[in-house]
């Protein structure tokens, strides 16, 4: 289905960190295709700082929480904006409810049936059940309204953020190590990270530990285990400050988590570590910076990081030597 006249369009992508970042190519395509259109984005409060002030977004609609009361309150705001089209890039009940509350006459979503999201859509013909990258699925929403697919080089808005965090030591040749993930099976053990940090230090890099508040204890353990100095930024950066750090890094090493996708978005050379998640679906096929995938899981396409089999290959099974070799292959020389 192609739309002949796109005037006011709303993206609904409420969460999470990585999912919001992976929706940026859709935003870029919509703005390039419909330069005079009003583009809005509905996002959960926790992730709004990623998008606040973005030049391609005319209206940022912030959902305080996913409870029904805040959803209905946001609906008042969305109806006042008079959107013609809503693209539900989340595909869940709350995002579909937000789309419905906008009163937009055209509400386009995926062909899956999750949490009864389809009952609020006017069109659920966008294919999302095949084994392709999540960015590809999101871009299909843009296809449905005639948006062009443009090469995604980087998000210059996020890449322009300064590295404003206070760091001691040499800032050159920073190796950003994203030490956290939503579940332990998706990342390296603290001992493995400490070994990687020491090997990078010996190779002329300054290791920087990246993570949120939930990774603070893990980062402190890595720092204690490492034989050489590291810069510990866990729980010390906002989203925009993190963008600045990743933009200025010589290389990023990360498992499948939000910061991995942010590194891709700002054009940082990245080594992606996969095991219980599928790089076909969540790796990098959308950015243009150097990216090496190290996949302990082989060709398996039925991975479930929430229910990991006892014999499953996990990220911690990736040899340190392979990670370091990948780093040296793609790291850029910083001035």
What does each model-identified segment do?
Residues 1-335:
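Catalytic machinery of carbohydrate-active enzymes
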